A protein has these predicted regions:
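N-terminal, membrane-interfacial amphipathic/helix-forming hydrophobic leader that caps
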Residues: 1-62, 199-205
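Transmembrane helix-loop-helix hairpins at the membrane interface
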Residues: 87, 91, 99-205
Length: 205
């Protein structure tokens, strides 16, 4: 029960700080003009909350391992490349390369989103609830999916498309949670998978 309370409270506070840009607001003079800088700072500041929670749950030298960050970077990268290569080839064949996409937008939507979303939603929320709070896979994965889907409601331009974005990303969240668990909680697998799945969505139209 203690683990669940700490994890859920920390995540609720993180989500509020991140969603309302409270982390990036004090630094807006430094991040103005760069979406990537704003997103990075907002994630880092908001991320101090789950980081503090992890210090309550684990010894400092065990935190990276509890998140799945202490090993498997190379195997995660290989998995991500092989899993998304057909997607990249498919988009290249049927899509049009967007020559106007900026490096700042690419960094924001591919690298920062892919890394931090998996760090928080998979490594912290799902991983900590499933592995250490002893939640079952489905309860932990579904709660994470609802939160993850809600994060992407903005992608819809009306109610129907917003619900569609929610459904697709929530289902994707369950899939990422399953991959994370099946790969022995190697977070790099889902970080690379998420990042490289975002890439063709951004660079091809």
């Amino acid at each position: 029960m203690r683990h669940s309370i700490i994890i859920l409270t920390a995540f609720a506070l993180f989500f509020a700080v991140w969603y309302f840009n409270l982390g990036g607001w004090p630094f807006r003079a430094f991040t103005e003009g760069s979406q990537a800088a704003h997103y990075f700072v907002n994630y880092v500041v908001a991320g101090l909350i789950p980081a503090a929670a992890l210090l309550l749950l684990h010894r400092p030298n065990e935190i990276a391992s509890s998140m799945g960050l202490s090993r498997g970077f190379g195997s995660g990268a290989l998995f991500g490349v092989l899993a998304t290569l057909p997607m990249l080839i498919g988009y290249a064949c049927i899509g049009t390369f967007d020559r106007e996409v900026s490096a700042d937008h690419l960094l924001t939507r591919v690298v920062i989103a892919g890394f931090f979303e998996e760090l928080v939603f998979r490594g912290f929320v799902f991983g900590q609830l499933f592995r250490y709070a002893r939640w079952g896979f489905l309860p932990a994965a579904l709660l994470t999916a609802v939160a993850f889907g809600s994060l992407h409601l903005y992608q819809g331009h009306d109610l129907q498309s917003a619900l569609g974005a929610f459904g697709v990303t929530a289902a994707g969240s369950v899939f990422f949670s399953w991959i994370y668990a099946e790969w022995n909680f190697n977070l790099w697998c889902v970080v690379w998978l998420h990042t490289l799945m975002n890439l063709p969505w951004i660079v091809f139209s």
